[in-house]
Amino acid sequence: MKALLDLFKQVQQNEQFDAIKIGLASPEKIRSWSYGEVKKPETINYRTFKPERDGLFCAKIFGPIKDYECLCGKYKRLKHRGVICEKCGVEVTLAKVRRERMGHIELASPTAHIWFLKSLPSRLGMVLDMTLRDIERVLYFEAYVVTDPGMTPLKRCQIMSEDDYAAKYEEFGDDFTAFMGAEGIRELLRAIDIDRDAEMLRQELKDSKSEAKIKKYAKRLKVLEAFQRSGIKPDWMIMEVLPVLPPELRPLVPLDGGRFATSDLNDLYRRVINRNNRLKRLMELRAPEIITRNEKRMLQEAVDSLLDNGRRGKAMTGANKRPLKSLAEMIKGKGGRFRQNLLGKRVDYSGRSVIVVGPQLKLHQCGLPKLMALELFKPFIFNKLELMGLATTIKAAKKLVEIQEPVVWDILEDVIREHPVMLNRAPTLHRLGIQAFEPVLIEGKAIQLHPLVCAAFNADFDGDQMAVHVPLSIEAQMEARTLMLASNNILFPSNGEPSIVPSQDIVLGLYYATREAINAKGEGMMFPDVSEVIRAYDNKEVELATRITVRITEYPKNVETGEFEKTVTRYETTVGRAILSEILPKGLPFSVLNRALKKKEISRLINLSFRKCGLRATVVFADQLLQSGFRLATRAGISICVDDMLVPSQKVDIIATAEGEVKQIEQQYSSGLVTAGERYNKVVDIWGKAGDDVGKAMMDQLKVEDVTKRDGTKTTQESFNAIYMMADSGARGSAAQIRQLAGMRGLMAKPDGSIIETPITANFREGLNVLQYFISTHGARKGLADTALKTANSGYLTRRLVDVTQDLVVIEDDCGTSNGASMKALVEGGEVIEALRDRILGRVAANDIVNPETQATLYAAGTLLDEDMVEEIERLGIDEVKVRTPLTCDTRFGLCALCYGRDLGRGSMVNAGEAVGVIAAQSIGEPGTQLTMRTFHIGGAASRAAVASSVEAKSNGTVRFTATMRYVTNGKGGQIVISRSGEVLITDDLGRERERHKVPYGATLIVKDGLVIKAGTALATWDPLTRPIITEYTGTVKFENVEEGSTVARQIDEVTGLSTLVVIDAKRRGSVTKTVRPQVKLLNEQGEEVKIAGTEHAVTIGFQVGALITVKDGQQVTVGEVLARIPTESQKTRDITGGLPRVAELFEARSPKDAGMLAEVTGTVAFGKETKGKQRLEITDMDGNKHEFLITKDKQVLVHDGQVVNKGEMIVDGPADPQDILRLLGIEALARYIVDEVQDVYRLQGVKINDKHIEVIVRQMLRRVQVVDAGDANYIVGEQVERSELLDENDRVIAQGKIPATYENVLLGITKASLSTDSFISAASFQETTRVLTEAAIMGKRDGLRGLKENVIVGRLIPAGTGLAFHRARKEKESWEAEERTALLQSEKAARAAEAEAQFADISSTPDSDTDAS
């Protein structure tokens, strides 16, 4: 019976576990795993193909080759199970034990494990406090190390060369011991007293003052503490026994022709065994030291290359000079165990085929080829055949299916009914890349896909392939149906917009049907209802675009009862719109259709339908829109011809004018009036404008056509030109493309992104000549190369994002925090870029939202704001709302639903178990391929748009200046701005900010603070081409270091003959004058230097490189006068990183080069004494303490003497460093910075992503904290730990009434954050596998399997979605069972105790009668 049970035991699933621990194995442990020692390097006998005894494939050690059969064939079959054959020594059991039984090799000399030696920082070095170089010299037999100095003056761990050793040996004899090789290191490791060393280090840390020492000690202490905690002995890093991998995991397979294919590991093991055996022999023979030493070194190298080939020295190579693949390479990298086999597996019950369009399908269906379905659903068909008694065995059923018996098809229909399949299109960039559909059997071999889901899959029908997967279990089918069915996923999870938006011909059909034409056939007819309209249309009495009047039935929703009430209304509309009104879902008014439907409108329509009528109605509506769109597009019969491309008549004149202007510029250039750079910029500008003008003229001509009204008068209407309609509706093409067809192609770019100044004046209709064609191919190639690189880069960004966020899951409903972020509308340059409603939609209010007019609470805190609510908030003019955000969520090891808000892909509150981290990563990564790769050169053509020279108000209101705005009034009474960050605000009657405008330094203000103005009033003007340097004081100019030929050069204007001084670049000047900087001081009437008000510092105004000095030495100047101008052209064109690299830079939290400087404290600014190349800036804080900053002189300082700055304000111009923002302004400001910057990049490409996704990533970048003061908690100062863990530890400490640890936030880039997670499995599968595993093993780390990745790797259900509930139930059950067990044990204990008590009582109470009787 027991044997029978044993048989079943092997099938049963292993026990549940909650964590995985990694550590170092002791030699005893390795021997206990082993089933015997491998003594010979032989593998198998090449004649008999049987494994050699004691060899690498030995059956005695590793188990039999055939199931239940020993090697010599004495015992066969099940009845001998467990017998060990006395002839060949093989146990009779299953052959698959060869996958799990390990062997071992007893090493003749101890060997260091290369990971702990060479993986930086070297763990051996840290424990022994020796340098890696020294340890290596000892291990590879180049030097001796003293292990026991005895009574001699030598030190432990002292290194000496052979000659030194010989000399010392002569001197001291046997009083000291020194070793070479791993033995020496092992002795040193054994001698370490970890507890004592750790204590000493703690003391040193307290006493030490030097930063470097503290850092060093802390590192070593961390390693020692890890050993203390994990109970791992340091000398286990030196191996005495080498484990041997089970043979099936390093197979040897015979190929035809008598050759063998083998795993590289066998070669590596063979070398180790050979060298080991040779060393044993040499030691038995008592060979000379030098020979055994060499053999030991070779053994060490053999073991090294088995563990990690190529880590040290040259890699061992096989017969074909290819480096052998070691154990380390098996697990790391894309082809390693983690990423190849554990995170991504190949799946059974799957197939792939080309996709074709299936317009007749419903949204939740897909067409599955019969043959594919037959193969995929085989097991289900076999089952059915057996149940129906058509086949007795699986074999018979298989036969029936293979000959495709007619009954099989009926059964297939039956099996497929209501059994969803999953379709996937690679690359799967977001969760909509896999969706479930109900299969419909079709003839042919291609999968049919519903046209509306193409947008989500990013699929088209030019030969794309898709994979089909079959969910097998009932649970899997249920999840596929409820969560993944295409009709349940009609919104994009990235922004909450519909993903099933019609495109191309559907849009064209709907657009054509809803356009109106003047004086079309049957105009002005009246119809009682839509059916009559359809009759008239079918009888060709009216056209689609005819304007008619008709009674239309609508079903508005009654607010009180929630019922749909039938109403009939007369509408003036067109035939097409009336016909479309038939498919409008109940609850939507006809007015939404009563307009020309462009793509954006249709998207809005579907969104509206989803919000008002629910999911089911919307899906039906979308399907009907699709049908109508296709049908109407076919009826319309729109086609394009060459004559549709109307070339504007003005084109010739525009080009001629431009050519004239270019000639003029060329002449000015040849006569030296303009520089080469200016000429190029101006030419490019002229042609750019010419191209735009031609395009505009062409569009104006295309847009309208002449028609005759019914009364005979002439008028114009929107054109029915086919090309124009396609572009206008959003079906295909854009204005820019039409411009190339019928306008002019315009300027082309070179591969380096610079613009070729010769434009292509022709368009495609006229045709290009050879030169023009060549120019246009020149830049096109760059585009193709970019696209290929972009895809890889974008994929890598997505991978890093997923890795950093994969363990973030919604695990509770409410964390109870009242924190949040204040949201305002995003305004830039007076334009609202993102309205408040869009920013707070789908978020939860953190505070009560109050009606500003009545002060009544409008929405209580904790309300999820939906469309109607945000509209109400906007209507009331509330301009700031505090909402909950993932950043301030207090949930540990996860997020709460209220801080996250609406699940955008479902349109309702997020559910517990939703993997919001992965969704955020996908939402940001998925559009990555649409972003550009190039870094823009600002300057020249790209900056054309930026040349604004004034700013005007867009709305009526009151002018207000921000606190940072400063200006002086010059002699002419003009107000000149002298602050670098001043802004003008316009507020309405209630004092709410309506718009804000930045005003540059040197601008002239036209309005005053508090002025009431009308829209369109100019607020300020400035010269767009130069940047002035302005004086704020009156006095006489005194030049310093302004010397012609050394710091400045004189430029003479050839036309006017006037000369100006230009400051030259220090790099171009001689070495003597490099550090001198031309500047101006001002003198007063008495000839003394003018001082800065309230200080002793003289006013010094420095000139930057390229500045044109406009004043003369000794000239009298007044406040606000211009001393010099810097032409903006000569401002060095700085590269602005855009696109994908910018997003990656932000998420990696890289500090930009030449970063701007932020004020460390709030206080008053003063300039201190200047040093050679730097200027000194002092900020005196409120308590009177001074803080000094040294700033290189070429930087632009944004503050001036006496200005009060706030902590975190920019004081030196340059890009902000996210680390500074976090340190000085806190988490919310940092998040706002990263969110805004990332959104800028995506917005430029027209991609919408919800802010909360970026916030989720920022939360993960901030999940580590640095311990500032450990208090009584179990941490070292300066250690980085997981925030949640530290808070848990603090709770524990506080509960005991002790002092908790204090910490500061740390911002890590996404790669760094992924690698520093608490889960070593997740980190190892991401990057730097060796380093992660080495560190984890020494620390004896425990992986609690919290994240998704770890669970996928160990093959469990992930703790997200339905898996979260499963794991929770399991844990509850376990704790409940444990309680029950303890209760049971206690009751048994009590019973036993009672029993013993009773026995004891019996014994004591019986009188000694029996003794008497004896």
From Swiss-Prot:
Zn(2+) 1 binds at C70, C72, C85, C88. This is DNA-directed RNA polymerase subunit beta'. It is an enzyme of class 2 (transferase). GO terms for biological process: DNA-templated transcription. It holds the Pfam family RNA_pol_Rpb1_4. SMART domains: RPOLA_N. Mg(2+) binds at D460, D462, D464. The keyword Magnesium applies. Keywords: DNA-directed RNA polymerase, Magnesium, Metal-binding, Nucleotidyltransferase, Transcription, Transferase, Zinc. The RNAP catalytic core consists of 2 alpha, 1 beta, 1 beta' and 1 omega subunit. When a sigma factor is associated with the core the holoenzyme is formed, which can initiate transcription. Binds 1 Mg(2+) ion per subunit. Binds 2 Zn(2+) ions per subunit. Its EC number is 2.7.7.6. It catalyses: RNA(n) + a ribonucleoside 5'-triphosphate = RNA(n+1) + diphosphate. Its cofactor is Mg(2+); Zn(2+). It comes from the Bacteria. DNA-dependent RNA polymerase catalyzes the transcription of DNA into RNA using the four ribonucleoside triphosphates as substrates. Zn(2+) 2 binds at C815, C889, C896, C899. The lineage of its organism: Bacteria, Pseudomonadati, Pseudomonadota, Betaproteobacteria, Burkholderiales. Belongs to the RNA polymerase beta' chain family. GO terms for molecular function: DNA binding; DNA-directed RNA polymerase activity; magnesium ion binding; zinc ion binding. Residues 1395-1414 are annotated as: Disordered. One of its GO terms (cellular component) is DNA-directed RNA polymerase complex.
